[in-house]
Amino acid sequence: MTRALPDYYPTVAEDVITFCGIQGGRVWVDLGAGPGGLGLALLENVSDGVMVLMDPSADALRRALTAAHERGVYSRAVAVIGKAESMPLPDESVDVVFSRGSFYFWQDRAQGLREVWRVLRPGGRAMIGGGLGSGYPDWARREFIRRQRQSQARKGPDAVREFREARNPDTFCRLANEAGLKAFEVIGEGGQDPDAQNAGVGIWLRFAKEAEDVG
């Protein structure tokens, strides 16, 4: 019998909070939220503020709102149909944008990053990429990566190459530069080596919109 792996959303949420901080009254955006796993895990760890769950799939958002109701955070969750390349939000209207796993599927990733920058308020932060969370158990991280490798191998060498290229730090840096980001950091190596101590981190593009960057 295949051993069940623990949920990684709580540990990823911890990493997002560590980078973005917790302040009262914040507006958060879970971009590419799907059924809301990460956004709702984060809501459970902050006492106030609003979570915008954004996804192009209305069905996924319906499931996210159902889950929000079941987890007691429905009053602070807002579902918005939208995609990264054209976010239906005003300029400088949110405090934090994060996205786990959807970045690899954006049609125009550089444009999506420009949109994230546009909607961030001065002082806002963004964390875009994928991973299991730095606090994810070692045994589970190794098993997750092993299963992931097997899944990609079954799709053929081209799929393996594309998968690795999408998660390469150089790819993240190139896209950030194409988007015109002035200051950013890429953390993690892509989470492809199960023996690496920071493999659970995965890979993330992190940046802040400072007041002096506006104008």
Question: What are the residue ranges of the model-derived segments?
Answer:
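A short acidic, Gly/Pro-enriched loop at the edge of an enzyme's catalytic core
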Residues: 85-96
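Core SAM-dependent methyltransferase catalytic element
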Residues: 179-215
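A short SAM/SAH-binding and catalytic strip from SAM-dependent methyltransferases
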Residues: 96-109
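Class I SAM-dependent methyltransferase SAM/SAH-binding core
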Residues: 27-86
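A short glycine-rich, Lys/Arg-flanked "PGG" loop and its adjoining helix->strand segment in the class I
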Residues: 110-122
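Conserved class I S-adenosyl-L-methionine
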Residues: 125-152
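Conserved alpha-helix/loop element of class I SAM-dependent methyltransferases that forms part
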Residues: 7-24
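Short alpha-helix
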Residues: 162-180
